[in-house]
Structure formats: C-alpha cells, structure tokens
Amino acid sequence: MNNIPKSLNVGGQTININIKDRIESDKLGECCVAEARIDIAKTFNGREQAYPSQLNTFYHELTHCILDTMGENELSGNEKFVSCFSSFLCEAMNTLKYD
C-alpha cells in the first residue's frame, strides 16, 4: 500500500486519518483512539516531511492505535518497539507483489 488512506477500522472503530500542516509540539504524527483519529504532519521542525516519511509515520501511528485498542499500553509506550515494528510493516506493505 503506497497511499495513506482517509480512514480504516481498528477493533470495530472507524479511525480517520488527517494530514495536517503541523502538529503541536512538532511531532511527525499522533494518534488518539478516544477521538478515533490519526494525524500526520506535513511539516516537522519547519521542514516538509517527505511522503515516504509520512507513510512510515502512518504505520507508526497505526501500530500505536492497534496496541492501544488491545489495551497494550506499556507496549504502545515502548517507542523502540513501535518504531521497529512499524518500519518492518511499512516495508512489507509497500513491497507486496501479486501474480
């Protein structure tokens, strides 16, 4: 999947994906399951976030969203795990081959 979707379902809840010019505290992205949203920043520290980085950020925030929905708050708070897992997921999804 090379495109960031507008929405998806996680645990029976529709999660809306918003591309924003900037996110407070200069984050690349953030998710809030309670508000059913994932936000991805176009800019970070005053610089444009390249599309491949936005896509990786989408998978990073999706990983948080899934773990939070599962009640795995400690694992979701482990940024090393989330970053590593989401990078592998992003790579796998973007290199899918079909016959």
PLM features per residue range, with description:
Residues I19, K42, L67-T69:
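Residue-level recognition of conserved beta-strand positions in structured domain cores
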Residues E48, C65-I66, L75:
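Short active-site-adjacent helix-start/loop capping segments
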